[in-house]
């Protein structure tokens, strides 16, 4: 018996997803196999494929896994701090790659177009995220940034932070969007007040606020389309 034959037969199952990726490519692998590759090894209680399956069962959807905290990941048997950090880093990198591919050379043609993209991008977020999209005079996207995470009710969002970036990018226009974790996109009095304040600041600086979009679970509300802008 050849030593190499013995090694192949006794190769741990942990290695199989990597071998399959080499043989057939990453697109043919299941979510469980891709997670197993990121995790690399299992534990004494469970092999890596079992740990990956437990992750998928625990969070049910990849969009829920995207929002998993370090502590939530570490609550899974077989995932320690190092593995949790590596998973969070991989997830964040994937989000940034997706976001970059969506905004590069893009053009804003309507609030609906922006809302449809952001609904997918911000799905499952447990906190309010305020997004600002910076545009040139032709409505080409220059940059997209998350201004803050929290709640507009807490008065965290300050026009200074938003317009400082607008000046930095030489933006002619901006478009704001934020999600309602409750799933209901109906604007609150604070949302309306914040929008009017941003519109006034934009007028003083010569930077137009095109719209403020509020995102729910499966729909959105455009404050401009709903006539909440003073310029309407």
UniProtKB/Swiss-Prot annotation:
UniProt xrefs under Gene3D superfamilies: 5' to 3' exonuclease, C-terminal subdomain (1.10.150.20), Cytidine Deaminase, domain 2 (3.40.140.10)
Keywords: Hydrolase, Metal-binding, Metalloprotease, Protease, Zinc
Residue sites binding Zn(2+) per the record: 178, 180, 191
Domain of life according to the entry: Bacteria
Residues covered by the MPN domain: 107-229
Protein name per the record: UPF0758 protein EF_2926
Entries under SUPFAM superfamilies matching the protein: RuvA domain 2-like
UniProt source species: Enterococcus faecalis (strain ATCC 700802 / V583)
GO MF annotation, one: metal ion binding
One Pfam family hit: UPF0758_N
GO BP term, pick one: proteolysis
Motif JAMM motif, chain ranges: 178-191
InterPro entries: MPN, RadC_JAB, RuvA_2-like, UPF0758, UPF0758_CS, UPF0758_N
Protein family membership: Belongs to the UPF0758 family.
């Amino acid at each position: 018996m050849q030593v190499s034959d013995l090694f192949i037969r006794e190769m741990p199952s942990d290695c199989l997803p990597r071998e399959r990726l080499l043989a057939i490519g990453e697109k043919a692998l299941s979510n469980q196999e891709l997670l197993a590759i990121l995790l690399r090894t299992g534990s004494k209680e469970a092999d890596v494929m079992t740990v990956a399956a437990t992750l998928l069962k625990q969070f049910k959807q990849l969009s829920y896994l995207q929002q998993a905290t370090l502590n939530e990941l570490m609550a899974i048997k077989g995932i320690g701090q190092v593995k949790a950090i590596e998973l969070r880093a991989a997830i964040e990198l994937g989000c940034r790659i997706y976001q970059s591919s969506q905004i590069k050379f893009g053009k804003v043609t309507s609030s609906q177009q922006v809302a449809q993209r952001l609904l997918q991008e911000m799905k499952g977020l447990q906190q309010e995220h305020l997004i600002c999209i910076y545009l040139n005079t032709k409505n080409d996207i220059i940059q997209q940034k998350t201004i803050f995470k929290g709640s507009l009710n807490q008065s965290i969002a300050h026009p200074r932070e938003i317009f400082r970036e607008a000046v930095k990018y030489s933006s002619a226009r901006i478009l704001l969007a934020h999600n309602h974790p409750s799933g209901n996109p109906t604007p609150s009095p604070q949302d309306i007040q914040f929008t009017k304040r941003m519109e006034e600041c934009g007028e003083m600086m010569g930077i137009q606020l095109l719209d403020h979009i509020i995102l729910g679970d499966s729909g959105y509300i455009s404050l401009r389309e709903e006539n909440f802008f003073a310029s309407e």
